[in-house]
């Protein structure tokens, strides 16, 4: 912020503008996934994502950051809903709680590793010409491009194209997935997969509204919590903040797979999604209202565990409750509501930080 003269209002705009392009490209990206297949589409997303991240190294002013955020929204728009849909095409419904949880576990692992690493890079990799934050984006962006290239060569589009499965295994898996799709279709008489027909489903609208609210809180925390944590003590360095921010995600690394497994074992999704949301809300209130440092840290842990543990059970709901014919569009629509929530909450918090 100091390097480029970014004000709190600029920061709010930078945080929010991402969600505009993220929102706009949700549905087109899901269509692209279906047209081109997972291997080509997801690898392209990852390569573009990494390239834009790395190019932030050369940013000269606020406008460059705003432009980068717009393009990050374009590329990121299709990744998460694409992966949720991709996993639903590979794993039976009874296993999707733990499968989604293990996929989301990457968020916790990345946060545990990235938070202290980012703080260290920003603090120690300063050169006369390039500040630490620039090196942070370069170090994160370049490996992502190479991972995208590997994805193109290694990711199969569907179980039928998996070289490591025998014909018998492929047949058994495809038959099981077909049975799950028939069960889900029986709950939804509307087989019209057009966009307008899909989004009129009241179940989809309920799922989308709930996701918008919880993701608004999560996305706001991603941008604003490090500053709040640094305000816990005047003695905290950037490295200290990174280490503290990794604590809740360490606990989440253990809670997420267990909670997803428990959801599968009980074959129950709704309460397994709702209870972690409640825990995250309690954590937020503790961070904001409790003066004790130890209780604030406990609240931070509640937030991290809750905000990540709900993912697995929640994302098992769309494939169980919505029509398979419109599932890709449904997942993209739900995720687009998170970007709307993120845009509104970041603009609101920017206003509050300036005037209050």
PLM region descriptions:
Residues 5, 37, 58-64, 75, ...:
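Helix-breaking motifs and short loop linkers at transmembrane-helix boundaries and internal kinks
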Residues 23-63:
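Conserved MFS/SLC helix-loop-helix module at the cytosolic interface between two early adjacent transmembrane helices
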Residues 25-37, 122, 254-268, 353-354:
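Helix-to-loop junctions at the C-terminal end of transmembrane segments
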Residues 34-46, 264-277:
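Cytoplasmic membrane-interface "Motif A"-like loop-to-helix N-cap segments
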Residues 93, 103-105, 128-195:
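Central mid-sequence intracellular linker of multi-pass
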Residues 97-129, 141-144, 335-345:
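Glycine-rich segments within core transmembrane alpha-helices of 12-TM secondary carriers
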Residues 194-260, 311, 315, 345-349:
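Extracytoplasmic gate region of multi-pass secondary transporters
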Residues 265-317:
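C-terminal transmembrane helical hairpin of 12-TM major facilitator-type secondary transporters
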């Amino acid at each position: 912020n100091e390097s480029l003269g970014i004000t709190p209002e600029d920061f709010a705009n930078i945080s929010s503008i991402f969600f505009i392009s993220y929102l706009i490209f949700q549905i087109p990206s899901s269509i692209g996934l279906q047209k081109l297949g997972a291997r080509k589409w997801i690898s392209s997303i990852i390569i573009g994502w990494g390239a834009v991240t790395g190019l932030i190294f050369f940013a000269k002013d606020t406008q460059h950051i705003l432009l980068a955020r717009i393009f990050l929204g374009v590329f990121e728009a299709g990744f998460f809903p694409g992966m949720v849909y991709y996993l639903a095409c590979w794993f039976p419904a009874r296993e999707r709680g733990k499968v989604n949880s293990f996929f989301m576990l990457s968020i916790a692992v990345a946060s545990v590793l990235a938070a202290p690493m980012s703080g260290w890079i920003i603090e120690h990799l300063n050169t006369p010409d390039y500040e630490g934050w620039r090196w942070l984006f370069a170090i994160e962006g370049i490996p992502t491009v190479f991972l995208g290239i590997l994805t193109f060569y290694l990711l199969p589009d569907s179980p039928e194209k998996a070289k490591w499965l025998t014909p018998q295994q492929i047949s058994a898996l495809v038959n099981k997935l077909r049975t799950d799709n028939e069960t889900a279709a029986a709950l939804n008489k509307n087989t019209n997969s057009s966009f307008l027909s899909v989004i009129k489903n009241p179940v989809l609208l309920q799922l989308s509204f709930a996701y918008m609210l919880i993701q608004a809180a999560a996305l706001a925390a991603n941008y604003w919590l490090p500053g709040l944590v640094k305000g816990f003590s005047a003695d905290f360095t950037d490295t200290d903040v990174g280490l503290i921010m990794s604590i809740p995600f360490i606990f989440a690394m253990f809670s997420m797979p267990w909670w997803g497994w428990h959801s599968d074992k009980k074959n129950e999704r709704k309460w397994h999604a709702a209870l972690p949301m409640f825990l995250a809300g309690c954590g937020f209130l503790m961070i904001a209202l409790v003066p004790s440092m130890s209780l604030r840290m406990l609240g931070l842990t509640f937030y991290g565990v809750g905000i990540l543990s709900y993912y697995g059970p929640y994302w098992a709901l769309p494939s169980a409750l919505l029509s398979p014919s419109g599932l890709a569009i449904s997942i993209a629509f739900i995720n687009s509501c998170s970007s709307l929530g993120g845009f509104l909450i970041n603009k609101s918090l920017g206003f509050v930080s300036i005037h209050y």
